[in-house]
């Protein structure tokens, strides 16, 4: 997380310092963040972990796909390097292993709740990326 925050600060400094400061998150960033916060504070640990997994997994997949295509002077290369790197891949693999272990050692009902949380977080992740791509903002 520390490396990610440093990377984001560096990217903003290099490429967005001339843009007006955005004081609030986009609609789906706001909703997704609140969903994850709610899961982390109210759900069983197994369900909370399941809700976090799609974010890491998607970033890993996007990083690996982007890392496979080398583009000279890519302004996103540091981002690609972070999310396609060995350290991040190990973190994701560890998270997935933990998620699988939690699922194997819990009740059927909790497994169903884990699946629902994973599916909802995956939907949120997709809408987060779509919203960024379409530059969605609050309509009112």
Predicted regions and their residues:
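Short, flexible helix-adjacent loops and helix caps
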Residues: 41, 68, 103-107, 133, ...
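Generic structural hydrophobic/aromatic packing signal, biased to beta-strands
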Residues: 8, 36, 95, 128-129
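Acidic, carboxylate-rich catalytic segments that either coordinate divalent cations
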Residues: 113-140
């Amino acid at each position: 997380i520390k490396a990610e925050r440093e990377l984001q600060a560096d990217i903003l400094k290099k490429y967005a310092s001339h843009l007006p400061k955005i004081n609030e998150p986009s609609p789906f960033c706001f909703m997704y963040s609140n969903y994850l916060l709610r899961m982390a504070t109210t759900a069983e640990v197994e369900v909370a972990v399941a809700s976090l997994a799609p974010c890491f997994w998607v970033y890993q997949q996007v990083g690996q796909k982007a890392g496979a295509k080398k583009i000279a002077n890519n302004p996103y290369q540091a981002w690609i390097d972070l999310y396609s790197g060995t350290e991040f891949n190990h973190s994701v693999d560890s998270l997935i292993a933990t998620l699988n272990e939690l699922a194997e050692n819990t009740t059927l009902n909790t497994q169903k709740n884990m699946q629902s949380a994973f599916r909802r977080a995956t939907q949120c992740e997709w809408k987060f990326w779509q919203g960024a791509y379409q530059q969605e903002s609050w309509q009112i």
